Amino acid sequence: MTEDKFVRRSLRTLSAGLEALGHEACPTTVAGWLRDLGYNLRVNVKRLTGPTHPDRDRQFRYLEEVIAEFRAAGLPILSVDTKKKELVGNFGNPGAVWVEEPYEVNAHDFLSAAQCRAAPYGLYDVLANKGHVVVGTSADTPAFAVDAVARWWVRCGCKRYRDAGELLILADSGGSNGCRPRLWKQRLQMLLADYYDLDVTVCHYPRGASKWNPVEHRLFSQVSRNWAGEPLRSPERMLSLLRGTRTQTGLTVTAEWTNQKYRRGEVVTDEQMAQLNIEHHDTCPQWNYTIKPRAPGWWHWN
């Protein structure tokens, strides 16, 4: 007898196996016996996150402090991340919707049948409870991420926070806006700090803690709920569903589309990194830093 604490066979198979051994029991009876023994049908539980970083709790406490400082000063706090890529075309979308007849969609999600593969980059304004999504059709690179932040600043941020000289960005520690990509920091220096004369502070969430990033549960969760069961048949339809996302707490969402191309693998040299005006914080410097404007003229970059 094994030490397994689970049963893989179906109730009918177990019933037939018992009958072969001379014990008659219908599938319903077998199910009752299993429950009496403490067995139930269960799905996998995603609970194990692996070893946590030793500075995880310290970083969360520091995040609370920095957010509180910016909130008290009325300075913009922007939570950012890329939502999962979506195939634009007549493809099924998880969820149900009230309709007279079900939507007929493609049986297979082949990229060749899609108009494009869209990468929605979400930007959530924590103080204003407003969301903005820049949908790109190229690679999800640090250049795309910073361009999206710059688009938000021009379209929303500079109007909502006219006298602000500082910006706090909350981001995951991985991905296009992670703490490692040099291009993310270089583009923030050139496109935001230098060009718009902003002190840009970035605080990253520790590995495995992306669900605590406000953009995930304040913006992306509402977007997913709004377009559940709705095929994203065209760019216009996708933008319409994004812009139609609202909540009773006042969340509204704006959205825009960009077909700009981004190259993967852009390299930032040590010399270029040395030219950045970046200050790493004393607390968890790998996750917290402020990029300040350089002398006038630096924004005339190639």
Indicate where each model-derived feature is located.
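Acidic, metal-coordinating catalytic cores used for nucleic-acid/nucleotide bond scission
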Residues: 171-184, 206-212
